[in-house]
């Protein structure tokens, strides 16, 4: 009897031939226990080719959380695009879930900061700088009295101007100005500073009017209105527009806070003609402006 020749196989099919010598791993098993846990048994080969059995015990815990209904509704939206077939929840290959940091502000967060009231150096510095704020004695603005635009036409608030001018009082800068009448006399104190406009026999109001009681000096002295109870949101242009209805306005000064830029509640309006100032005072006194009632009166002039 002739021998039957064994068919020759291609070398590419050698890997596909299972001769039964390769050991297979058992299928993973999942066992449900009586206490509600699950035992998952799996098998694998380690680096030495040894078969390793892995047993994991898993307990499923349901965590109930009260969330915004809008958030819960968005979680039920159907996915689209390349993630249309993905299950609910974030997919590991398309979504990176970071750590959920819950921010809970404390009601006593100020106590956690450094208590500056217990710092002796801070208190000493506050006491040192307490009286360093510049304040004008004429209009209460945040500038030196010597630089006040109304120093030649108004007396300091709450004070009566001395005869011969307002230059005899103290200034914010600590300098002592001699009285105008004594500035040009032989008894003037040596070394005291006298403004150029007040040297000699000149008096206040003469530097722009020519002589004492000059036309411009009288007009500037008697045609300035002091407006109080002004809203902190007011602007100089708004005040100019309101008062220009009664005549030509030559100057508008609105005192503002240096830090916030808001109005400090008072302003000065100067008219070219006193008759226009009288009409404006009678009409605008008690006028409502930005939910406040304006108080308009003639500014105190220097006597």
Curated annotation (Swiss-Prot):
It is found in: Cytoplasm. One of its GO terms (molecular function) is translation initiation factor activity. GO terms for cellular component: eukaryotic 43S preinitiation complex; eukaryotic 48S preinitiation complex; eukaryotic translation initiation factor 3 complex. Residues 109-126 have a biased composition (Basic and acidic residues). Residues 223-301 form the RRM domain. One of its GO terms (biological process) is formation of cytoplasmic translation initiation complex. SUPFAM superfamilies: RNA-binding domain, RBD (SSF54928). The keyword Methyltransferase does not apply. Residues 1-32, 81-100, 105-126, 181-215 are annotated as: Disordered. Keywords: Cytoplasm, Initiation factor, Protein biosynthesis, RNA-binding. The keyword Protein biosynthesis applies. Pfam families: eIF3g (PF12353), RRM_1 (PF00076). Component of the eukaryotic translation initiation factor 3 (eIF-3) complex. RNA-binding component of the eukaryotic translation initiation factor 3 (eIF-3) complex, which is involved in protein synthesis of a specialized repertoire of mRNAs and, together with other initiation factors, stimulates binding of mRNA and methionyl-tRNAi to the 40S ribosome. The eIF-3 complex specifically targets and initiates translation of a subset of mRNAs involved in cell proliferation. This subunit can bind 18S rRNA. Belongs to the eIF-3 subunit G family. This is Eukaryotic translation initiation factor 3 subunit G.
């Amino acid at each position: 009897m002739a021998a039957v020749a064994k068919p020759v196989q291609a070398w590419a099919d050698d890997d596909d031939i299972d001769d039964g010598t390769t050991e297979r791993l058992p299928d993973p098993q999942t066992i449900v226990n009586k206490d509600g846990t699950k035992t998952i048994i799996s098998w694998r080969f380690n680096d030495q080719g040894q078969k390793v059995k892995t047993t994991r015990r898993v307990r499923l815990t349901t965590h109930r959380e009260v969330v915004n209904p809008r958030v819960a509704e968005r979680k039920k939206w159907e996915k689209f695009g390349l993630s249309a077939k993905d299950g609910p929840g974030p997919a590991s290959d398309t979504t990176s879930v970071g750590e959920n940091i819950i921010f809970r502000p404390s009601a006593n967060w100020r106590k956690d900061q450094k208590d500056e009231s217990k710092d002796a150096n801070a208190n000493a510095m506050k006491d040192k700088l307490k009286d360093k704020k510049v304040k004008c004695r004429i209009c209460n603005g945040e500038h030196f009295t010597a630089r006040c635009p109304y120093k030649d036409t108004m007396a300091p608030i709450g004070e009566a101007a001395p005869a011969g001018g307002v230059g005899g009082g103290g200034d914010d800068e600590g300098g002592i100005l001699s009285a105008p009448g004594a500035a040009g006399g032989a008894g003037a104190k040596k070394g005291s500073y006298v403004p150029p406009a007040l040297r000699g026999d000149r008096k206040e109001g003469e530097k722009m009017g020519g002589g004492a009681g000059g036309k411009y000096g009288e007009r500037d002295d008697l045609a300035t209105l002091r407006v109080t109870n002004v809203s902190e949101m007011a602007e100089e242009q708004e005040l100019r527009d309101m008062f220009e209805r009664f005549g030509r306005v030559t100057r508008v000064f609105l005192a503002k806070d240096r830090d916030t830029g808001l109005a400090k509640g008072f302003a000065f309006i100067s008219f070219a003609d006193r008759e226009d100032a009288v009409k404006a005072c009678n009409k605008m006194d008690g006028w409502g402006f930005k939910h406040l009632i304006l108080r308009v009166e003639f500014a105190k002039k220097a006597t």
